[in-house]
C-alpha cells in the first residue's frame, strides 16, 4: 500500500512554475518533473512528461480512473482504483525493448519515460513556441514489495528507512560526473545546473532504472533541485523525520527550501510504503 502527498511552489523569483507532479495511490505511482528554467515552455514539457508516464502506466499496468489536476502550492488529490496486471510481455508493447534485468514495473517506467521523450521532442520540433523545451523526471512505482525508480536529469528520490537516508538516484549533471557522490561540493559548484541528460532534447535519452525490495514503513522523498539544491542531506533527513505525517513532511521541505532562499520552483512528494 502506498500513501503519498505532494506540494509545489512557484517560489519568489521565477515568473511561472515549471515543476509538475502527479500521485496515483491506486497505481502505487508518484511522478515529479522539472521543466528546465530558461528553456521555452519548460512547464509544458514537465506536464507532458508526467502525463505521459502516468498515462502509460495506467494503460499498460493497471485500470485507473482520472489521475489528478493542476496543483499550485497544494497537494494533488489522492485517487484510488486499479488492479495489478501480471501479464507477460507482449509483442509491440515494448517499443524500446524489454530489459530482462528489470522487473515488469521497471520496464513499464523505462518505456513510459522513453515515450515521454519522443512526445516532447516531436512537439518541440513542430512548434517554434515550444522549440528547445525539455525536462527532468523521476518516477517511483511499487509493485508488491519491489520499488522501481525511473529517472532522467537531476530530480531526486531519497529513501528514509531505519537510521539511514539514501539517495537512490544519481544526477545527470556535469558536476556529478566529475565530483561523484560529494553532494555538498555539487551543491556549491557554479556549474551545478548544467545537465548532461534530459527528457525531450534528443531522439533517444538515457533512462536510468534502479530497483530494490522494501520491507515496510520506508519513506520516499521525490524532490526537484529547487529543494535539494539548497537543503543538504542532513537537513532533508531531519525534516523528513520530524514530520508527523506526509503532508507536514512535504510542506516542510518546500517551506524550508524557500526560507533558505531557493531561487527555483520547489516541489516535494513524500510517500510511505505500508506492507500489507
Where are the regions that the model predicts?
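PP2C/PPM-type serine/threonine phosphatase catalytic domain
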Residues: 1-276
Amino acid at each position: 500500500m502506498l500513501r503519498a502527498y505532494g506540494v509545489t511552489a512557484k517560489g519568489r523569483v521565477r515568473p511561472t512554475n515549471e515543476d509538475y507532479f502527479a500521485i496515483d495511490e491506486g497505481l502505487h505511482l508518484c511522478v515529479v518533473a522539472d521543466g528546465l528554467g530558461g528553456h521555452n515552455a519548460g512547464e509544458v514539457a514537465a506536464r507532458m512528461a508526467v502525463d505521459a508516464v502516468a498515462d502509460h502506466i495506467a494503460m499498460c499496468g493497471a485500470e485507473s480512473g482520472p489521475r489528478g489536476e493542476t496543483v499550485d502550492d497544494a497537494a494533488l488529490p489522492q485517487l484510488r482504483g486499479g488492479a495489478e496486471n501480471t501479464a507477460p510481455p507482449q509483442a509491440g508493447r515494448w517499443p524500446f525493448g524489454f530489459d530482462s534485468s528489470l522487473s515488469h514495473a521497471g520496464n513499464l517506467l523505462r518505456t513510459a519515460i522513453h515515450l515521454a521523450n519522443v512526445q516532447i521532442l516531436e512537439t518541440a520540433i513542430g512548434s517554434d513556441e515550444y522549440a528547445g523545451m525539455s525536462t527532468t523526471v523521476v518516477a517511483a512505482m511499487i509493485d508488491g514489495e519491489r520499488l522501481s525508480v525511473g529517472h532522467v536529469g537531476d530530480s531526486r528520490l531519497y529513501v528514509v528507512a531505519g537510521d539511514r537516508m539514501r539517495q537512490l538516484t544519481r544526477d545527470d549533471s556535469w558536476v556529478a560526473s566529475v565530483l561523484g557522490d560529494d553532494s555538498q561540493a555539487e551543491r556549491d559548484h557554479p556549474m551545478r545546473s548544467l545537465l548532461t541528460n534530459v527528457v525531450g532534447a534528443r531522439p533517444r535519452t538515457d533512462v536510468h532504472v534502479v530497483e530494490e525490495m522494501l520491507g515496510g514503513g520506508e519513506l520516499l522523498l521525490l524532490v526537484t533541485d529547487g529543494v535539494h539544491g539548497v537543503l543538504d542531506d542532513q537537513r532533508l533527513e531531519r525534516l523528513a523525520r520530524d514530520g508527523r505525517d506526509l503532508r507536514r513532511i512535504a510542506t516542510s521541505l518546500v517551506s524550508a527550501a524557500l526560507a533558505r532562499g531557493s531561487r527555483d520552483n520547489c516541489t516535494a512528494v513524500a510517500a510511505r510504503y505500508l506492507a500489507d
